[in-house]
Amino acid sequence: MNVLIRYCFLFCLCIISVDIVAQTLNNNIKGLVKCQGKGVPNVVVTNGFDCVLTDINGKYTIPYHRDARFVYITTPAGYLPVRKHSLPCYYQRIDGESQTYDFTLIKNSKNDIDHIFLVQSDVQVAKESDIAGYVKYLQDVHQYINKQIKNDELFILDCGDIVGNTPSFFSKYIEASDVIDIPVYRTIGNHDMEYGVRSYEHSYKTFEDYFGPIYYSFNRGKAHYIVLNNNYYINRNYRYIGYIDERTLQWLEKDLEFVPKDHLVFVSMHIPSSSTKELQFNALLPDETSNAASLYDILKGYDAHLLTGHSHYNWNVVFNDSLMEHNTAAVCGTFWKADICTDGTPSGYGVYKVSGNKVTWAYKSIGYPITHQFRVYPVGASDERPEDIIANVWNWDELWKVEWYEDGKYMGAMERFEGYDPEAKIICSDKERVVYDWIMPIKTEHLFRAIPTNKNAEIEICVTDRFGNIYKEKVKTIK
């Protein structure tokens, strides 16, 4: 009798085991990544939790995860995703019915070892008139591309705050963006979240409905691009903090396992990691990324650049020889009420030129040539420093030089100081123009000063960027 019971038990156990294995196999997601009808090997496929490679025939199998909304690919160098106007179609929604998800790639007709990308942030459309401002910006982008960028591989990175708490404008933003026919890779911003939902996990679902996963990656040449969500909704009115959750950090670690150490890495996220070289642990939680140190640790060993927005002003921080942050000023300027930001930076966008694993960059002001890299103020323009000439050099970093000449005589380097941009101060004090009472000028550290020996002399300011490009501007006296 005992033997019979034992055999029955073992038989049942085998049946259960087979059923579990069958369910596991059935729950796997599989598919094919192909180009021109042929499978593409070694393409990274992810469900947001796991990362796998396609085999020699372009096939993949990845575990089903109950919290995964998408299966998506990291577009490999030399290829492009299928595109619906400006929207790259590198992902598919897991619908719960199908287990097979195939992807089609397009062979890039251009050599993407050399490529260019533009960085925009804080478009922040909240009403119809804002769309008109965004269209004007896109016209500037289109003109710049036609004149300066001809046959290079090109795309745009949007660092978030596409709308201003108005998800209903996502479709209008997309429609406007489609005019320039360039792929745009979007990053979620705090004003792109859904507020009033019960938890962080629900705050980004509307964004995903329009633009796909909130974290993902793609390649061009010897550069790896990563988009992250660091807006952590804490469900108290409109409260959020700058924070990258553990799920995203774990995915990032897995994603980077497939990236050679000699490749450039760019990370796009909305909220800055830090506005200072040394992390300030008393910084306001919505203004910086509270666990930025964890991100830095994961990026060690790579030459990495962080691309952020959120602040509505422009600055660069060099953390060390292999890590730098570029915080890009707002496309919307002073919330579409003026074409400069509250630090005096003109509305604009970043232009990054990648060659192999090297990169150069510049800031492009809307309505100006790319040589417009600073603004000068004569004696008397600043009520803070009425005796000084002042230069606002918005894309400055520690490797730039700002020098001045008086009547052709070299006078030396100008002194950097923290203060208010005179024009921004005037604009922000005009409450009828800016409408919002809370708009104020902010102090910036990319201002430079000098006191002329003769205030009526011909003054010229010469700025040299970190790449050796020289920009000159004469100071016009106030009459």
Feature map (PLM): residue ranges:
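Aromatic sugar-binding surface patches on proteins
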Residues: 421-449
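Extended active-site neighborhood of metal-dependent phosphoesterases/phosphodiesterases
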Residues: 77-82, 88-93, 167-261, 282-307, ...
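Short acidic, glycine-rich surface-loop motifs adjacent to enzyme active sites
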Residues: 256-281
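Short amphipathic beta-strand segments in non-cytosolic proteins
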Residues: 25-26, 32, 36-37, 43-53
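Hydrophobic beta-strand segments
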Residues: 43-47, 70-71, 402-404
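N-terminal active-site segment of His-dependent metallophosphoesterases
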Residues: 24-29, 35-36, 75-170, 455-460
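Binuclear metal-dependent phosphoesterase catalytic core
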Residues: 323-396, 400-407, 445-474
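Short, acidic Ser/Thr/Gly-rich low-complexity loop/linker segments typical of extracellular
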Residues: 49-63
